């Protein structure tokens, strides 16, 4: 980028405060320029008497060089910085001893700038040192126009743009290593010339690659907004490479940049180890089981006992392999279940006590003894079962403690389930009259599941698990909490954190006066206007309370609630429709078979009739033939018979004649005797 800086020839000279009085006098003296320059390296001379270069063109001066008395080193002042940079003079030092070594190195730099047109020129002015040539005129001040691509050991080139070669820069350690390998020490680094034509990153005040001014990675807050002093040319938030920076000299150093100094450009903060991160998932709430997830919420009302019927109906419609149902119970709802369970247990205990009393009163009776033995056996079994249950709970608690001490996580996350049946002794919940496979939750479970920061939060997991939430029954207390946004229990916490893309059904159940209250209407209006994902069912008319009051405040019929749930979930499953179609097809096939059977039977009957007719015809023909034959035979027989009869008649006639003659003779003889 030296060609851009060389075009600005209208720059003024060095400020007067940077030069001594003698130097200003020498500059002010009038003299003609000398044109005896022999080459680009003519200014390099011995240590005692430095040779002043001659100028080859009368162009204006841009850079002025000052040599000290010893001639071992000089100071070069540049007053023509890159456009856009602050005009602050920069002083660098050079050593002529290293000129030849640097010239050899700089002949083949890794990032050599292409040769530019010879029409663009750069000027350098070398002024004689103070005390060596005090009386020298301006004609002794020689200028030189170097050819493009040539390097001078004692001149300072205008700094190249720090934004043009950002992708070719290295970090500070690689630059230091390169300098050390070329020059052989840190002293030569400080005295080396930074004016080579190689496109290295340079800045008037400091190294551009200084990590204190160019942080190489994103901040720990993951912010992509750069500081005002940092110019970033890339917009890729993932791969942020090193870029040149334009920084103020007075800007304070950031501790964040210092801490990020040793990190690579693409480095990422160390994440937590995977084995130490517990998956935010409760095993009792599987989300990828391919089932419909229905979450019921029950509050303290007498209609809470209809929950069992709704669960059974849904399972009958979908089947247990297609639907999964879980229940959230408030403290009031658990009290209703607990009171009912206690009544049942009290009746059982009373029956056992009465049986004991009867057995004791009828100790001599054999039947009484049998009852006593049976009751005693039952009592002993219950006692042993309670003892075994207590031992099992103790063992379970010990195992939980061991697991928590070894793994650091509660055992509830390891797959243990809390059921509503009495067989699970680990459960500390009151006995709930729900199916044994139904998982129910109470407020205490919120704290039993959560032990540390990485454990799942129950109401968040329930919100993620459920496809629909049905609060049935809904009391006025919970209604007010929902409308006002309170979340002081598990159910209201789930509703407060609910995803609006999933539906919520509310089935109110309260007294007539409570339902007709102004606050109740206000709460319903808030829910209707502000919560479009919530549907409030119309209550049913029924007798409320022991006083026989009839009001429109009872919970909707359980079958209607189930129907609305099924419709919201997409309608009745295709399995039942397929079964109905199969049944229709079976019925059609049976009808066809029946028709075919009846048609075959008719055809068989027709065939049989035809066969019978044919047989009859044949029989008739045969009969006719037989009859004819018989007739012929009969005729013959008749003829024969007639002949025989005739013969017989003749014989008979002859016999009769003989008899008549005999009689006559007898008569004659009798008469004669008489």
From Swiss-Prot:
Modified residues annotated as Phosphothreonine in this record: 90
Sequence ranges of Polar residues compositional bias: 15-81, 106-116, 152-164, 351-368, 403-426
Gene Ontology molecular function: catalytic activity; FMN binding; identical protein binding; protein phosphatase inhibitor activity
GO CC, one annotated term: phosphopantothenoylcysteine decarboxylase complex
Effect ascribed to mutating residue 459 to A: Does not strongly affect the phosphatase inhibitor function but abolishes PPCDC activity
InterPro entries for this protein: Flavin_trans-like, Flavoprotein
Residue ranges of the region described as Disordered: 1-164, 190-230, 348-368, 384-426, 575-674
Keyword Phosphoprotein: yes
Pfam families: Flavoprotein
Biological process according to GO: coenzyme A biosynthetic process; intracellular monoatomic cation homeostasis
Gene3D superfamilies, A to Z: Flavin prenyltransferase-like
Composition-biased stretches (Acidic residues): 580-591, 603-660
Compositional bias per record (Low complexity), positions renumbered to this chain: 214-230, 384-395
Keywords from the named record: Cell cycle, Coenzyme A biosynthesis, Phosphoprotein, Protein phosphatase inhibitor
Start-end of Basic and acidic residues biased regions: 137-150, 198-212, 592-602, 661-674
Annotated PANTHER family: HOMO-OLIGOMERIC FLAVIN CONTAINING CYS DECARBOXYLASE FAMILY, PHOSPHOPANTOTHENOYLCYSTEINE DECARBOXYLASE SUBUNIT SIS2-RELATED
Family designation: Belongs to the HFCD (homooligomeric flavin containing Cys decarboxylase) superfamily.
Record's subunit section: Interacts with the C-terminal domain of PPZ1. Component of the phosphopantothenoylcysteine decarboxylase (PPCDC) complex, a heterotrimer composed of CAB3, SIS2 and VHS3.
Function: Component of the phosphopantothenoylcysteine decarboxylase (PPCDC) involved in the coenzyme A synthesis. Acts as an inhibitory subunit of protein phosphatase PPZ1, which is involved in many cellular processes such as G1-S transition or salt tolerance.
Protein name in UniProt: Phosphopantothenoylcysteine decarboxylase subunit VHS3
Gene source species: Saccharomyces cerevisiae (strain ATCC 204508 / S288c)
Lineage, uppermost ranks: Eukaryota, Fungi, Dikarya, Ascomycota, Saccharomycotina
Name of the gene: VHS3
């Amino acid at each position: 980028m030296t060609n851009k800086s060389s075009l600005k020839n209208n720059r003024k000279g060095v400020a007067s405060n940077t030069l001594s009085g003698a130097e200003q006098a020498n500059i002010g003296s009038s003299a003609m320029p000398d044109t005896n320059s022999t080459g680009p390296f003519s200014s390099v001379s011995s240590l005692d008497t430095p040779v002043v270069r001659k100028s080859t063109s009368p162009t204006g001066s841009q850079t002025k060089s000052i040599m000290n008395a010893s001639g071992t080193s000089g100071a070069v002042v540049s007053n023509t910085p890159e456009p856009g940079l602050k005009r602050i003079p920069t002083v660098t030092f050079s050593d002529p001893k290293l000129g030849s070594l640097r010239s050899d190195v700089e002949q083949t730099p890794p990032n050599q700038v292409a040769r530019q047109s010879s029409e663009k020129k750069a000027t350098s002015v070398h002024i004689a040192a103070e005390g060596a040539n005090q009386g020298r005129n301006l004609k002794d001040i020689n200028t030189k126009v170097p050819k493009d691509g040539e390097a001078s050991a004692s001149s300072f080139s205008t700094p190249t743009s720090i934004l043009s070669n950002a992708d070719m820069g290295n970090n500070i350690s690689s630059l230091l290593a390169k300098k050390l390998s070329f020059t052989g020490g840190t002293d030569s680094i400080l005295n080396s010339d930074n004016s080579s034509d190689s496109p290295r990153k340079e800045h008037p005040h400091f190294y551009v690659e200084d990590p204190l001014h160019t942080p190489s990675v994103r901040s720990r807050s993951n912010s992509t907004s750069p500081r005002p002093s940092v110019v970033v040319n890339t917009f890729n938030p993932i791969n942020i490479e090193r870029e040149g920076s334009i920084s103020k000299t007075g800007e304070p150093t950031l501790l964040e940049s210092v801490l990020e100094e040793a990190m690579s450009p693409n480095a990422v903060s160390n994440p937590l180890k995977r084995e130490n991160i517990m998956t935010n998932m409760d095993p009792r709430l599987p989300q990828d089981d391919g089932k419909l997830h229905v979450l019921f919420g029950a509050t303290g009302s007498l209609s809470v006992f209809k929950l069992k019927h709704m669960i059974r109906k849904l399972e009958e419609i979908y089947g247990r392999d297609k639907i999964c149902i879980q229940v959230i119970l408030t403290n009031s709802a658990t009290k209703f279940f607990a009171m009912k369970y206690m009544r049942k247990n009290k009746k059982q205990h009373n029956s056992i006590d009465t049986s004991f009393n009867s057995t004791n009163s009828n100790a001599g009776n054999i039947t009484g003894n049998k009852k006593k033995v049976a009751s005693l056996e039952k009592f002993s079994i219950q006692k042993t079962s309670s003892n075994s249950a207590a031992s099992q709970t103790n063992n379970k608690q010990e195992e939980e403690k061991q697991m928590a001490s070894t793994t650091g996580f509660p055992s509830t996350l390891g797959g243990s389930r809390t059921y509503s049946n009495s067989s699970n002794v680990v459960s500390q919940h009151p006995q709930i009259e729900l199916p044994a496979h139904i998982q129910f939750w109470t407020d205490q479970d919120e704290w039993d599941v959560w032990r540390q920061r990485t454990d799942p939060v129950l109401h968040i997991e329930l919100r993620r698990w459920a496809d629909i939430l049905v609060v049935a029954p809904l009391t006025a207390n919970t209604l007010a909490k929902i409308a006002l946004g309170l979340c002081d229990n598990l159910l209201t916490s789930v509703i407060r954190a609910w995803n609006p893309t999933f539906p919520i059904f509310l089935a109110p159940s309260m007294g007539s006066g409570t339902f007709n209250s102004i606050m109740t209407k206000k709460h319903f209006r808030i829910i209707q206007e502000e919560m479009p994902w919530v549907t409030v069912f119309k209550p049913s008319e029924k007798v409320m309370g022991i006083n026989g009051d009839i009001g429109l405040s009872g919970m909707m019929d359980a079958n209607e609630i189930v129907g609305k749930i099924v419709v919201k979930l997409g309608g009745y499953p295709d399995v039942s429709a397929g079964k109905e179609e199969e049944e229709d097809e079976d019925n059609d096939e049976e009808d066809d078979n029946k028709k075919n059977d009846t048609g075959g039977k008719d055809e068989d009957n027709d065939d049989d009739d035809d066969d019978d007719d044919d047989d009859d015809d044949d029989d008739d023909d045969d009969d006719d033939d037989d009859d004819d034959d018989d007739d012929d035979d009969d005729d013959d027989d008749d003829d024969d018979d007639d002949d025989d009869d005739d013969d017989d008649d003749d014989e008979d006639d002859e016999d009769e004649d003989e008899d008549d003659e005999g009689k006559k003779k007898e008569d004659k003889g009798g008469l004669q005797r008489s």
